[in-house]
Amino acid sequence: GYMKYKDPKQPLLGRRXD
């Protein structure tokens, strides 16, 4: 759920697998 970690517009920076 990468959109939950950092910025939904930058999934590559916030993606964590899930």
From Swiss-Prot:
Q: Which UniProt keywords apply?
A: Cell wall, Secreted
Name the principal localization, coarsely classed: secreted
Cell location: Secreted, Cell wall
GO terms under cellular component: extracellular region
The organism sits in which domain of life? Eukaryota
Query: What is the protein's name according to its record?
Result: 66 kDa cell wall protein
